Amino acid sequence: ILNEERKYWIYIPETKAGEKGKAYPVLYLLDGDSFFHSVVGFTRFFSSSKTSNLPPCIVVAVLNTDRTRDFTPTCSAARRDGTICPYDKPAGGGAEQFHRFLIEELRLEVENKVPANGTNFLVGHSYAGLFTLQTLSNHPESFDSYIAIDPSLWWDRGVFLQQAAKNVYQKDF
């Protein structure tokens, strides 16, 4: 779908005695090359805590090749402050194609390799947080839970917020 080879890392929780064949939820982590170790540590710590409801999770860290292309909903030359410089080349707009890759290619490949239980989380930060919200807005059935950390809502002069406002009234979340 993306016409390129994508790398990813996988963490599988340790199986305890008597839990052979146990399946786990899968947390898909965008910007995986930046956050893999901290998210694995977080899930290990909180899934072993008696005060947390987080179950042990498989973590699939999706590595980046072009964040702007993959995580943004529109092609834009607008800067963070909304201005457009005539020398800036428009970029981005590949979020829908990247969503197809996640669901139609990566998820199928992962589910053939790991003991997944069918529950899936999507986690993204910044541009990936924008992608996470875009996926929730346009394809809410794709994941069971969404975590968007500091999403880049400024992208293309706030186009996501404009689209999401329309979607809220058209969809049943």
Where in this protein do the model-derived segments appear?
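Non-catalytic cap/lid and distal C-terminal segments of serine-dependent acyl enzymes
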Residues: 1-173
